[in-house]
């Protein structure tokens, strides 16, 4: 899930090499799940390094999985995503993705779109988050969002606002 300090995805070079391997296997996009220490400087360096190696041939996304410690850390890493032309920044910091206000502020300060609502459950709360301006994309998970019926309703919600939903 995340980068692994015990080998595997243990460095920015390893992430970039893996992204290149994925491209060689035919993948057109690559989502980074960095390390779980929440080191903003290291995450930003990883973003820029991977983009330098494959950014001109793959769509890149970053999911820190709520591991960045502060809003400022999310802004710092988000600026790296801007520089590297990332497609989205997902669940960036440790509010667990539940503050529409703070994510609206982050959206206003970045050009990289924000993907939120993985940790927001149900149709109404996702609608509230979207209407408050806290996200550019919606996330739905049938396991947690009222089953297949709930996921379909969330998809219809997204469609009605012209927003994509990631399932």
Residue ranges with predicted function:
Residues 1-16, 63-71, 115:
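Active-site mouth loops of central-metabolism enzymes
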Residues 12, 24-27, 83, 158:
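Generic intrinsically disordered, low-complexity segments enriched for polar/acidic and small residues
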Residues 15-22, 46, 50:
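Structured alpha-helical segments in the cores of large, soluble enzyme domains
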Residues 18-33:
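Catalytic domains of carbohydrate-active enzymes, especially glycoside hydrolases
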Residues 34-167:
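Catalytic core of soluble alpha/beta enzymes
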């Amino acid at each position: 899930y995340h980068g692994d300090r015990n080998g595997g995805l243990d460095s920015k070079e390893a992430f970039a090499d893996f992204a290149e391997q994925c491209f060689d296997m035919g993948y057109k996009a690559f989502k980074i799940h960095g390390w779980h220490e929440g080191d903003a400087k290291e995450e930003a360096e990883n973003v820029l390094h991977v983009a330098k190696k494959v950014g001109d041939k793959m769509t890149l996304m970053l999911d820190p999985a709520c591991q960045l410690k502060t809003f400022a850390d999310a802004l710092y890493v988000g600026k790296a995503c801007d520089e590297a032309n990332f497609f989205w920044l997902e669940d960036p910091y440790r509010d667990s993705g539940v503050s529409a206000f703070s994510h609206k502020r982050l959206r206003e300060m970045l050009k990289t779109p924000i993907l939120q609502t993985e940790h927001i459950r149900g149709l109404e709360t996702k609608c509230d988050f979207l209407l408050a301006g806290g996200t550019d994309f919606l996330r739905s998970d049938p396991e947690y969002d009222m089953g297949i019926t709930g996921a379909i309703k969330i998809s219809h919600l997204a469609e009605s606002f012209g927003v994509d939903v990631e399932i």
